[in-house]
Amino acid sequence: MKLNEMREILDRRGIQLTKSLGQNFLHDQNQLRRIIEAAELSTTDKVLEIGPGLGPLTELLLEKSGEVLAIEKDGRLVEFLREHWSAEHRLGSMKNPTTPSRCSALQLLHADALDFLKHEARDWSDWKLVASLPYSVASPILVELACGRRAPKKIVATLQLEVAQRLMAQADDDNYGILTLLVQLDFEPQSIFIIPADCFFPAPDVDSACVVLDRREQPLLPENLRAAFVKIVKRAFSQRRKMMLKLLKMDWPKEQLEAVFAELKISPQERAEKLSLEQFVALTKSLSVGSLKSKL
């Protein structure tokens, strides 16, 4: 779908795009193809798409994969997509009555994606997330999907450049923080490419980037320690320039923290931004959940 087609559809239907919903639609065909290539799709793949908009990426996903679940919050766009795919389904049936329409592989859901993910007890481990995520909810959606063995096997997400850089960051990087660690606990960053702002309509104020994340083959932590990891990370970065040990004293006894820091060869003066993911994992394993001053 080209830019002039997008404009024509929106004008014809009287749809004014809403900034609060992060509605910036990717129209550049070269960038769309790069996203599809990065997803490494096969006809057996199941794909979750969040925020399909007018459906340019959806069309390519249906060509390459076996099943697509597209979740759209804006009812005006859902109405357009249903009409569009119903018309294509009828046209396809007329041309090839014995060949299944690709539309039959599409499930279009009118819902708030973040609410859906929070309440949907689905195992996503056989799915891939391939989406141009709305800026306003991209980070919480990724954290919600980082759920251990139920997490998607691959994420190919187009995001605001700043968010993408956080996902790819390493310790001692300005972009390194809570989002980095909560997502990288389950996913290994593979690659990133920049998508200029003028590839979207309307053009956002900043560039975007597409990141590729693969789910880790082996979990870094057992499920029963995930909540403790989250607590440690959030507490450690609550004041990122402050010494970690002082912050963690709010949750664990000082004597235990000093002993664990010494065992792991972490300086008592160290700040959270200096610790690697592996060090946070080791810290989580070494601190006794039973000695917590408050509940997880």
Task: List the predicted regions and their residue ranges.
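Short helix/strand-capping connector loops at secondary-structure junctions
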Residues: 259-268
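Catalytic cores of RNA-modifying enzymes
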Residues: 1-234, 262, 273, 277, ...
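Short helix-coil junctions and helix-kink-helix linkers
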Residues: 249-250
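Short, well-ordered alpha-helical segments
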Residues: 256
